[in-house]
């Protein structure tokens, strides 16, 4: 579920860059995790980057969003900022990496590190970077 607040305290100003900068850092963290072979953390950091980037768009548009599903966050954007179907499909893939990389009970046995592959982490990072690029156009004008 996504909770959107249409408006913000003008005295506070937009916090769009405050959300987007950590999104960029999370992508960097994802790349470093990929290089280190911690593929589950690379996937999680990629998901976090996309989530924060979309929340930055809400801020840039004078709103706020709560929730963790990148798919639902994208769907809640106003039509002018909403991406096409390809990015929504990538968001669906990223949403799978919100819980799984962190908790062993996401799998029938073993730890998350036993299930994540380099290819999967690379796909997550690529998906995240594409979503960040879309969001960047709405945040950094």
Labelled PLM ranges:
Residues 1-141:
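Terminal alpha-helical segments
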